[in-house]
Amino acid sequence: MAAYAFLLGSLWAADPDGAALYQARCAACHDNNSAEERAPKREQIAARKPEAIVGAMFDGAMIAQASGLTLDEGRAIARFITGKEFSAASDVSMGKCDAPAKKLSFAPGDWNGWSVESDNSRYQAKPGLSAADVPRLKVKWAFGFPGDSRAFAQPSVVGGRVFVGSAGGKVFSLDAATGCTYWSFKADGAVRTAITIARPKTGSRYIAYFGDLRGTAYAVDASSGALIWKVNLDKHPYARITGSPIFYEGRLLVPMASFEEASGIAPGYKCCTFRGSLASLDAETGRQLWKSYTVLDPPKAFKKNKNGGQMYGPAGAGVWSAPTIDAKRKLVYVATGDSYTDVELNTSDAILAFRIDNGSLVWVSQVTAHDNFIVACPNRSPNCPEVLGPDYDFGTSPILRTLAGGKQIIVAAQKSGVVWGLDPDQKGRVLWSTKIGAGSVQGGVEWGHSADRENTYAAVSDVSAGVDAQPGISALKLATGEKIWSTPAP
């Protein structure tokens, strides 16, 4: 271990530019780690591939900190941290399918996009296997993402094919039976969304829709991977699409989030100007039909920080997850994240309802007010809100379900560790709330939850919740929120 540390130190020392850049851009968090900042220690990052670190700087969580860096400077930082050289470019032609794919068609048991249904219940009524089958499952094939060190996009399985995005910005179409590659497509940024497969018109070709971490939406031919259209939906430098696009009646609904809250560590940054949004596009052409912001008023200068820097607001309320379709009421629901500034904002940490036809806002149900938060505030960056909020975003999509008797309910799960039941007929009035986790900046319900016809199921992270952490999974009754069972994480 000592020899390894000496060698690693020697390699770091051999790259003084990388060391200097690291000190200027990275050390404040990674050499002074705290759970609040969600920053891994430098020795943890050193175990990663340099390619992964460059990806984080230019397409991922560190995009704010890397602002203004050249690619060569980013690579120097990655070499300094890891003590490793970059690998030769991976050959994406390896593993190509020998025969062309058959004509694409949907089949029972397919999983298309973020959820099988546009209500975002994430419930497969015809899975093709039972719980008793799970212990007998064996690995048939495995696919390694070329040049990547992590996989973070949910696959879609449609017509015997697997469609999946990657941290390296490539989208792949694989044979579900063998894992061979039919095609790959290179996006401009990392692709974290699920891939949605749809026909914009009856009888037309199937199209694969997705978004990247640079705020661009794409449509490619699902059979060949050929680009049909792409459109950037937000020019803000930290805009990103993490929520999966939803196809509905010829429209593509695309949510927008950002990583601007990570810019707070930079004292000179003019914080903050991003507004979450939802865009409706013509699914055939990519033409924007409407775009509605979750922050209704444009940001304005409202005060100077302690360093004399101009601050702006309101800002925030990004939409991290897929929108939810309410076909009966002709509405689309989104769940929002926190506010970035001290300017009052009643649409953060909320469920919002927009009209599908024109994007007009119908109602707002905010469950956590005054959640003003940006990253690195334990170090008291001059951009920090006066009173730091708990960072209780909604990272999951709202779920719309029909109860026995016909009444409908919206279920939403939050990073606070609370699951909410809302009434869609009463402007999102809270029907019940049940706390299943401690909640924290990395706690509560982070991404996915689901619901069948009677219950809702939510997994709790609570990574940074300390002694109060309650990681695990819980089942609640849809009608009342009553906890039926809870199983702790292993």
Task: Indicate residue ranges for each PLM-predicted region.
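Short, solvent-exposed loop/turn elements at domain surfaces
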Residues: E36-R38, S118-Q124, G147-A153, F172, ...
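Gly/Gly-Pro-rich "capping" loops immediately C-terminal to redox-active cysteine motifs
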Residues: A19-Q23, A27-Q65
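Electrostatic cytochrome c docking/interface patches
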Residues: L8-L21, D98-P100
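Blade/loop signatures of beta-propeller domains
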Residues: G95-K140, T294-P299
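Asp/Glu-centered strand-loop micro-motifs enriched in Gly/Pro and often flanked by an aromatic residue
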Residues: Q124-A132, R136-V157, V162-F163
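Extracytoplasmic/lumenal domain signature
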Residues: A132-P146, V171-V191, T196-S204, Y209-A239, ...
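C-terminal capping alpha-helices of c-type cytochrome domains
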Residues: Q65-D91
